[in-house]
């Protein structure tokens, strides 16, 4: 019984301790909320400089128009030393930050300290506030608000458009497969390292926790690299080249081992994924929400309406062909007639040989009806169906100098001459005037 009471007392003490750590401590170290919060308003094209911790707020003064689809509003903070920047939605959030909280105290150490940062403001946000906290008293910083066309948003929109309309072609391209694999390998090298280490670990090891940590570390490292890319390229370019070479080669090796996608279902999944990413990029890059939704819907309908348009066009062609009057057939020339006759004759003779050589052919019945069985057997074995004498007679009669052609030519000429012959006119004899 005493043990139960003692255990309850320990649990109660632990709960009180956690409550004191998480909840605000107004009696110990709470800043006075009655003190008025000093906030500096930010205006477009105006820069302010300070050397102490301040609170800044920007309030929207105009409604976004259709011409602001790729317009960007950003707050740039540049300082001589490291600072801590926190973005909130309104002034009430700033007042809450002024109140000491143990959870906020520990989480503030996880916030990134930067000396040059950009904060992007939503065009539809009524108010955006920023708190700048100095870690060193001897620090000067400047805050500027700017608005204008962002070429990066337009580039992202074009990339989304390309991925959506050419997703099928890209999903089947080997160049896209290898380039995407190498790029993903360079950006997620930490995750790939964690995956390789998981293969060496026992099956009961906490791999999923390690994988989650790898994702978090990879995202954090990628964020740091992109924010400090210019400094890295100028100061540590040797290490950057070595890193890109090693990681790029390893990524290419992995892509080469597994090879491009060949299964049609896998290609379709990649195609749908690229199209979905393209729609998301188009939606994110356009700052006006209703215009973004309209563009996404139009792009989707345009892509899907391709098949109904093809079906309608095919149906229209069929209806048009049925209703159209048949035109006069084109007559063959003499050369085309001879070629076609030769081809069709050879084809018919081959079919006749195959029919006579088939097991179902009544050979004895056929031989009993023909006059020259030996000639028929030679024909079935591949010999010509005409004798040299028959060929000579045919050429003599129907060749270029044959009698049939001469009769046709001279017969036509005689008919023409007969038609052209005109009887001489008969004039009446005039009477004598005498």
UniProtKB/Swiss-Prot annotation:
A family per Pfam: NEMP
Start and end residues of each stretch annotated as Interaction with banf1-a and banf1-b: 326-434
Keyword flag Chloroplast: no
Keywords on record: Developmental protein, Erythrocyte maturation, Membrane, Nucleus, Signal, Transmembrane, Transmembrane helix
Residue numbers spanned by region A: 176-287
Record's signal peptide: 1-29
PTM remark: Phosphorylated.
UniProt note: phenotype after gene disruption: Morpholino knockdown results in defects in eye development, reduced expression of early eye marker genes rax, tbx3, six3 and pax6 and reduction of cell density at the neurula stage. Co-knockdown of nemp1b and ran elicits reduction of cell density and eye defects more significantly than the individual knockdown of either one.
Motif (Nuclear localization signal): 317-325
BP GO terms, sorted: erythrocyte enucleation; erythrocyte maturation; eye development
Domain of life: Eukaryota
InterPro entries: NEMP_fam
Bilayer disposition of the protein: Multi-pass membrane protein
Domains as described in the record: The transmembrane domains are required and sufficient for its oligomerization.
Family the entry assigns: Belongs to the NEMP family.
Cited function: In concert with ran, required for proper eye development. May be involved in the expression of early eye marker genes. Contributes to nuclear envelope stiffness in germ cells. Required for fertility. Essential for normal erythropoiesis. Required for efficient nuclear envelope opening and enucleation during the late stages of erythroblast maturation.
Subunit annotation: Interacts with banf1-a and banf1-b. Interacts with ran-gtp.
Protein name, as recorded: Nuclear envelope integral membrane protein 1b
Source organism phylogeny: Eukaryota, Metazoa, Chordata, Craniata, Vertebrata
Gene name per UniProt: nemp1b
């Amino acid at each position: 019984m005493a043990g139960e009471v003692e255990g309850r007392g320990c649990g109660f003490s632990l709960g009180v301790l956690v409550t004191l750590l998480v909840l605000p401590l107004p009696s110990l170290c709470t800043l006075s909320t009655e003190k008025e919060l000093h906030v500096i308003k930010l205006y477009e094209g105006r820069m302010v400089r300070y050397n102490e911790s301040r609170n800044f707020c920007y309030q929207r003064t105009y409604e976004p128009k259709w011409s602001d689809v790729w317009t960007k509003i950003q707050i740039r903070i540049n300082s001589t030393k490291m600072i801590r920047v926190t973005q909130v939605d309104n002034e009430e959030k700033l007042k809450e930050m002024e109140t000491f909280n143990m959870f906020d105290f520990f989480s503030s150490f996880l916030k990134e300290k930067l000396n040059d940062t950009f904060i992007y403001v939503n065009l539809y946000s009524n108010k955006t506030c920023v708190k700048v906290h100095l870690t060193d008293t001897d620090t000067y910083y400047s805050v500027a608000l700017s608005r204008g066309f962002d070429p990066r948003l337009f580039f992202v929109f074009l990339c989304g458009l390309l991925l959506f309309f050419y997703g099928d072609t890209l999903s089947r391209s080997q160049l896209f497969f290898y380039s995407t694999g190498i790029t993903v390998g360079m950006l997620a090298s930490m995750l790939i390292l964690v995956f390789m280490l998981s293969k060496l670990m026992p099956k009961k090891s906490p791999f999923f926790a390690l994988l989650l940590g790898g994702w978090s570390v990879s995202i954090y490292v990628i964020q740091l690299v992109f924010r400090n890319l210019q400094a890295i390229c100028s100061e540590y370019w040797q290490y950057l080249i070595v890193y890109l070479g090693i990681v790029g080669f390893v990524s290419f090796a992995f892509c080469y081992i597994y090879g491009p996608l060949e299964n049609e279902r896998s290609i379709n999944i990649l195609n749908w994924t690229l199209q979905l990413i393209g729609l998301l990029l188009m939606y994110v890059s356009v700052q006006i929400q209703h215009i973004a939704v309209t563009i996404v819907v139009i792009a989707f309908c345009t892509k899907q309406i391709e098949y109904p348009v093809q079906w309608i066009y095919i149906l229209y062609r069929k209806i048009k062909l049925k209703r159209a009057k048949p035109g006069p057939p084109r007559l063959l020339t003499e050369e085309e007639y001879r070629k076609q006759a030769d081809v069709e004759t050879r084809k018919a003779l081959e079919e006749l040989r195959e029919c006579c050589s088939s097991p179902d052919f009544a050979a004895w019945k056929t031989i009993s009806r023909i006059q020259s069985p030996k000639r028929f057997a030679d024909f079935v074995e591949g010999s010509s169906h005409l004798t040299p004498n028959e060929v000579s007679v045919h050429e003599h009669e129907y060749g270029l100098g044959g009698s049939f052609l001469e009769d046709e030519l001279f017969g036509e000429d005689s008919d023409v001459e007969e038609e052209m012959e005109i009887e001489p006119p008969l004039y009446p004899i005039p009477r004598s005037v005498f």
